[in-house]
Amino acid sequence: MGIFSIANQHIRFAVKLATAIVLALFVGFHFQLETPRWAVLTAAIVAAGPAFAAGGEPYSGAIRYRGFLRIIGTFIGCIAGLVIIIAMIRAPLLMILVCCIWAGFCTWISSLVRIENSYAWGLAGYTALIIVITIQPEPLLTPQFAVERCSEIVIGIVCAIMADLLFSPRSIKQEVDRELESLLVAQYQLMQLCIKHGDGEVVDKAWGDLVRRTTALQGMRSNLNMESSRWARANRRLKAINTLSLTLITQSCETYLIQNTRPELITDTFREFFDTPVETAQDVHKQLKRLRRVIAWTGERETPVTIYSWVAAATRYQLLKRGVISNTKINATEEEILQGEPEVKVESAERHHAMVNFWRTTLSCILGTLFWLWTGWTSGSGAMVMIAVVTSLAMRLPNPRMVAIDFIYGTLAALPLGLLYFLVIIPNTQQSMLLLCISLAVLGFFLGIEVQKRRLGSMGALASTINIIVLDNPMTFHFSQFLDSALGQIVGCVLAFTVILLVRDKSRDRTGRVLLNQFVSAAVSAMTTNVARRKENHLPALYQQLFLLMNKFPGDLPKFRLALTMIIAHQRLRDAPIPVNEDLSAFHRQMRRTADHVISARSDDKRRRYFGQLLEELEIYQEKLRIWQAPPQVTEPVHRLTGMLHKYQHALTDS
């Protein structure tokens, strides 16, 4: 496909984006808004953002959800801006500096919350800064400006949603159904690999792919939930399927690890059974029926615990899968599965990364302020706004440097494109609303196609072009003002990119160490006799951390294996029949405190000291288990965990 070719699958969204822009433009001028540009810009960003992220037309609900987040972020930013102005109107410089800190604070929060919701906080940060900068000449008009900005943004969002609904957005339900079938087959094939106990790298690749696919399925569940309330039952089932899929991965990998030391546990009966190849979900269904009969014949005691648990989880998965596909009423058996253990939320391991993002945003905004005051440039305020926008939006993404480059390319492309519209097209179409709408529809259509291709600079070009062309009421054509705005955007993006390069993010290794120590803490916390604590479902949170580790350190197999071993240890100890007595309960609390100290330690010396203390306590704990005559189901996992911690002590403690 050529660089300028248009694929059929890209046309519908391009028309949708053009429609959203035209609707916002028409409504903005019809209601005599002072700056319809904000409504048009909002409609374009809300519609194009999810398409750029998805690399194609977004699924149903994505644009609507992004619109709601933008409304929330705008209102938070407007309220914050009003509070800052009211409190510091007599000290303009201090007021702007506080706004810079507010933008940094919002970026810090957006780095810690779920990636889907971080957009609202990033928006809240730079909205307050936009209000404070814009009202500098006339501070008394602040409330009016805040209300107008909120109104224009809401109009733009409504127009984007209307355009989305008008062109019947894609439903993700069929993709979910197909993935559920395919995922079950992949789970069975992973168990086959683990029972064969073949090449470790092949097994590592297989379970790594399954972790990614299960995480992707969880993202699909979020999309399905946003799409319509009629999928509420399917959403409940998919949430439980997420845990079951992770359980299947854990049991398969534990089956592989057990054979490293005790291969005789997997009998020839099960080895021969899992030799049969499967290609479809129907094949898996037949094999599971046979497998349940084999287990009933051999007895639970003669069946390895990992295979028994795997079959139980796969059977539940099948039952819920049928319910998701048919979306029928939840029956009593399903309800029993869905009333599972409460999920545990873990503390973010990226606090240092979030603090780096805070300083990047704050320092870049302060640098923009100093540049504005030092030069006295009329478009310094525009540069300030672009700095805040780039840093607030870039920091929450995995590669902020590339986002900043995208904005630089976009603002550079917007200069000639905006010049064409400013000097030729808009002056010749402003007398006709129809011609004006057609001209902007053409812009939206072609940039909409490029956005879906994820062309570098396409998203920045769309937003920057709309921002600098004259879409005010009434329209005024001052070339110097246009040039200042265009150059201000470019300078702002370059300054933001410079700060991102200078303030380096060296938090990757620290985040990796914190994640690994959180796995250790989770395994240690599973050693408890507290009934409520044992019922907590840590599995989704642990695999979410593992997925983050895989993204931070792609290809680092030793780290992944260590993390997976800790997850397996957690699951095995959680179900182990630990003797119930006060002596062991008190020691469990002591080990949990020590594990927490390992995570919170700020220096390598303290971390090594607490880790050594934890290893000593585990040795004492093993002795206590022997005294209290704990069964092998308890002593063996604890012994394996202690051995792993001794083996990887340096990786878990040294920077």
Curated annotation (Swiss-Prot):
This protein's UniProt keywords: Cell inner membrane, Cell membrane, Membrane, Transmembrane, Transmembrane helix, Transport
Membrane-protein topology: Multi-pass membrane protein
Transmembrane segments: 13-33, 38-58, 69-89, 93-113, 121-141, 152-172, 370-390, 407-427, 431-451, 459-479, 482-502
GO terms classed as biological process: carboxylic acid transport
Localization, UniProt: Cell inner membrane
GO annotations of cellular component type: plasma membrane
GO molecular function: transmembrane transporter activity
Induction cue: Positively coregulated with aaeA and aaeX by AaeR.
Pfam families: FUSC (PF04632)
InterPro entries assigned: PHBA_efflux_AaeB/fusaric-R, PHBA_efflux_pump_AaeB
Function per UniProt: Forms an efflux pump with AaeA. Could function as a metabolic relief valve, allowing to eliminate certain compounds when they accumulate to high levels in the cell.
Recorded family membership: Belongs to the aromatic acid exporter ArAE (TC 2.A.85) family.
PANTHER family associated with the record: MULTIDRUG RESISTANCE PROTEIN MDTO, P-HYDROXYBENZOIC ACID EFFLUX PUMP SUBUNIT-RELATED
NCBIfam families per record: PRK10631.1
Protein name per Swiss-Prot or TrEMBL: p-hydroxybenzoic acid efflux pump subunit AaeB
Organism annotation: Escherichia coli O1:K1 / APEC
Top-level taxonomy: Bacteria, Pseudomonadati, Pseudomonadota, Gammaproteobacteria, Enterobacterales
Encoding gene per record: aaeB
